[in-house]
Regions:
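Extracytoplasmic
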Residues: 18-19, 25-44
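Central cavity-lining transmembrane alpha-helices of secondary-active solute carriers
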Residues: 60-76
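C-terminal ends and interior cores of transmembrane alpha-helices
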Residues: 93-118
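Hydrophobic core of transmembrane alpha-helices in multi-pass small-molecule transporters
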Residues: 113-138
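Cytoplasmic helix-loop-helix junction between adjacent transmembrane helices
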Residues: 131-166
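Glycine-rich segments within core transmembrane alpha-helices of 12-TM secondary carriers
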Residues: 162-176
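Conserved small/polar residues in nucleotide/adenosyl-binding loops
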Residues: 191-198
Length: 202
């Protein structure tokens, strides 16, 4: 009965392409947030007094858990055992939590000289958030692939995968084009407290 219902749902072109639009938009947001800090590097150096070592440490965090803790492999196992709904929701929650931690780190002024694991506390917390986000977005990527395989068959499958990847990469383009204008419009990096530069000048 369940398989029959799934087959009926798959037969609906409207539902198939709506599902594709939903998962493609999710990955667009994921790719946008993956690359959103890259155009802000000069602003991070100017406003938060980051240096290239800090920024390099931060960007390396994306692969910490995925590479050294084999989270993509575990994510695939969870996907096979628990299904796309559980894994997809879990991946999105990791993305949201990671982004929230990164935003907290960037928007909070920590005491000057505060260090954590050899780096500024702000940098370390932002990197940790980025690492958690990286797990979420990569697991979301493999979940999306399985969703497409479930909903599309034959010649439509390759087209669906191509459209999903193309849409996701629009997120990277939007990050490069919109991030700096948005930061300028909202006032630097949406600070809720004075930046280290302002504190140093006062």
């Amino acid at each position: 009965m369940t398989e029959h219902l799934k087959q009926k749902l798959n037969d609906s072109a409207v539902l198939r392409w709506s599902v594709l639009a939903l998962v493609a938009f999710t990955m667009l947001c994921g790719y946008f947030l993956t690359d959103v800090m890259s155009p802000l590097k000069p602003m991070l150096e100017k406003e938060l007094l980051w240096d290239s070592l800090d920024y390099g440490f931060f960007t390396s965090a994306y692969g910490w858990f995925n590479v050294f803790l084999l989270m993509l492999i575990f994510g695939g196992i969870i996907l096979d055992k628990m299904g796309v709904r559980f894994t997809g929701i879990g991946a999105c929650l990791l993305m949201v939590f990671g982004c929230g931690l990164k935003y907290y780190a960037i928007s909070t002024t920590f005491p000057e000289g505060a260090m954590l694991f050899g780096f500024k506390t702000q940098v370390t917390l932002a990197a940790l958030g980025y690492a958690i986000f990286g797990v979420g977005v990569e697991i979301a990527g493999i979940t999306v692939s399985k969703i497409i395989v479930k909903w599309f068959k034959g010649k439509e499958m390759a087209l669906a995968m191509g459209l999903e990847m193309a849409t996701a990469r629009i997120g990277t383009t939007l990050a490069m084009v919109l991030t700096v204008p948005l930061a300028d419009f909202f006032g630097c990096l949406l600070y809720t407290s004075p930046s280290p530069r302002d504190q140093r000048g006062s």
